[in-house]
Amino acid sequence: NPTCHGFPSVHNAHWDKLWEVCAENDVVINCHIGTGAQPPHSSPDTPIDAWIAAFPMSIANSAADWLYGEFLLKYDNLKISLTEGGVGWVPYFLERAEFTLDHHGPWTKSNFGGKRPTELFREHFLTCFIEDESGLRNRDLVGIENILFECDYPHSDSTWPMTPENTFRQLDNVGLSDEEINQVTHLNAIKNFNFDPIAILGRENCTVGALREQARQAGIDTREKSGGGNSAKITDRSGRMTSGEVQKLFAGEGATAD
């Protein structure tokens, strides 16, 4: 949501040239969680876990804002990636959008160019997951071609360095076919971002084993660690971490990490 940073909304003609250039050059627009409207902290006393748990789903507000943008009707190939937002919330979001069009459309005058909200979403939006079995189980409601895997490296939500094992566990639990696994792990990304590392490097150099060997030879430590191997003072405490404490941390006050 650019208005959070003092810019015009995505519905303003201010951005028309950007949409045009992105569409002409097949550039995906990445809408990352937290870059615009962040989910509010319920209170300073609320355990920070509550905020972390709800954070990915906060992107639904941005998804709704963009889905109702008439600029999507001008550019059939414009793609928006809902980065780090997960997938599980999407089926109900689309169901609600369908209900809204049928129930409120006569007075809201929403314009989907004769299409349904779900149809427009599948044409223009990409969803990204780190760990989201519920979303994968409902892939038919989202569109398998709209789901991409990510690992969030190097942030705290990342499953690195055990990302391959963690990801395969999810895909295996859900029962994705080999074709579907290839789609969500790399083919969808290659297609939409127009970047094919397999073609550039060779498939034999893009396997988990090959990449881990490259890391080993480069002296990269891929052992599982907490805090990157450093001693984090904020973990040397008893009691629950609250929203207020974390807000102070990011403001440069209170607890710090070495």
Short names for language-model regions:
Residues 1-120, 133-145:
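Histidine/acidic residue-rich metal-binding segments in metalloenzymes
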Residues 69-70, 78, 88-89, 107, ...:
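Mid-to-C-terminal alpha-helical segments outside catalytic/metal-binding sites
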Residues 120, 124-126:
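Aromatic- and acid-rich polysaccharide-binding/catalytic face
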Residues 152:
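Active-site glycine-centered loops adjacent to acidic/histidine catalytic or metal-binding residues
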